C-alpha cells in the first residue's frame, strides 16, 4: 500500500498519445464551429439526431432509449434511459456553453469622425484590455419586425471580413499607461470598427448610412431590427495545437466548452447504462446562471417533474437518488504566476480530470461544498475505471475565488461536485488546456454515466 499520495501524469501512465491526439482533433473542430450557446445547441441537435436520439415529448421512457430536449434555442439536454427506473436516480453532468464575449448594445451603430463603430457591452468576467487589437467575429440572430429569425455570422470564413477594437499606440499612451490595469481599457472604449466608406449624398453620418444599406441589402433589415437582436463579438481565432510537442490546445471558449464537448461525447459513446444518464449544456453561467436559460431558472426542475410524471414516479425520489457532476473548469497551476496558487492544492496540466470539492471566495462563500461521501463515491468510480484524476482548488485562500452551477443543483437536493479540466488563462480570448486532461475528462464522464 502506497502511504503517500502522488499525482499521476497521464503520459507517464502509458496512455496512448495517438488516442489522445486523435480525440482532440474532434474537440478542436467543435471549438471552431460552436463559439456561442446558440451554435452549440444547433450542432448538438444535429449530432444527437445522427446518433439516433429523438426529441423528447413527454412519453414514458424505454430502457436504452435516447432522447433530447432543446430549450429556448440555447440549452441542450440529452439523455439515455437506464435499465433501472428514474426513481433510482439519474447520473447528471451539467456544463455550460456560454463564454466571456462582447455583446452589441441595443443601439450599436454610431459614427464619429467619418468612422462607423459598434458599441459593445462585455459579457462575463473579462480583462478588458485583452479584447483589443485581435480579430473578432460577429455572430448571433436578428428578429425582424415580422418575427422572422435571421442568422448572422461574419468573420468565421477566411473570406469574411473581421472586426477590430483599437488600442492606443505606445507613443501616445503615456496617460493610459498610468491607469490601473483594471481600467487600462474601459468598457466604453470597447468599440469595434464597422466601416469607413460613406454613402452618396450630403447628409450627416453617411458612413453609418452606408453600413445600414449593406445590412439591408444582405439581411433585409433596418436599424430598428437591431434592437431585437442578439449579436456578439467573439475571437475569430481557430483552435490550434500548442507547444513543440503539440500537447496543448489553444482556443477561445474552452471555459466551459471543454467540459461540454467531453461530457456529450461520453454520452454519445455510452450504451445501455444502469441508471439514466443525462447531459446538460446550460447557458448564462458566466453572469451568475440568471435568466430563463440559466441553471437558477426552473427549466431543470420542470424537466425532472415532467419526466417523473410521465413515468409514474415521485419526482422527490428522482432527486434524492440522483447525483451530479458540475462539469466546469478549474485554474491550472501556472509557474509564471505561482504566488496566487497553493501548489499542493492546485490542478496541474497533464495530471487528469480535476475534482473540486468547493469553490467560492472569502470563506467558501457561494459554494455547495460537496460532502465527503460524494467525493469518495466519485473517487471510487474513477479509480475503478482507471481514470487519472486530481484534486484542485481555485488559488490561495483570500486571493480571489469563483463559482459554478454546482451550488444551484445542490440547492435542489442533488449531491453535486465540480469536476472538469484545468485551464491556463481562463476567460482570456485564447485559453489553453492539456490534451491529456481533455481525454481524461471524456474517460471520467463516461465512467460516471455508467455508474450504478
PLM region descriptions:
Residues 1-452:
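N-terminal hydrophobic/helix-forming segments and targeting peptides
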